[in-house]
Amino acid sequence: MQSEVCEVTESARLYGNTYILWLQMPASFQSAAYGQFVMAYASEYSDPLLGRAISIHRMREGERGREFALLFDVVGRGTDWLARRVPGESVRVVGPLGRGFEVRPGVQRMLLVGGGIGCAPLIWLADDLVEQGREVTMILGGRSDAQIFPPHLLPPSVEVVVTT
């Protein structure tokens, strides 16, 4: 776990008040595990003082190396500040934090269940499971359709069940 200043490579509103923020991945994050999170600090100053705990949502190869994504809802000043970052700006993060989870090697069929923003770390897992040739069914839940992670952003072979 280290404090790192990461450059923003992409930022977008995905749906409703949910945003994705892609950041350059520092070397200290190479060992990140599914289910881990970062504390993202919402300014270069001390207001707001506390970081925001945000799950590591996805990983990818970018133009300048590995990148990781944070998926979050805008619910206050801190997450609003994060949502307004643009490529080239920086965000300070501490992590990876928490006890991630592993998948048993012999399991071929996986059922992943997540609701609302709670599905964020499962998307990275689904990406990797599909890449490994495993079958994935994902149950996405939310209070309304507006709070469901868009199924078209999942790998095409993932079977999706939506519940509201």
Regions found by a protein language model. Name each.
Residues R77-T164:
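FNR/FR-type flavoprotein reductase catalytic core
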Residues Q2-P87:
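Ferredoxin-reductase
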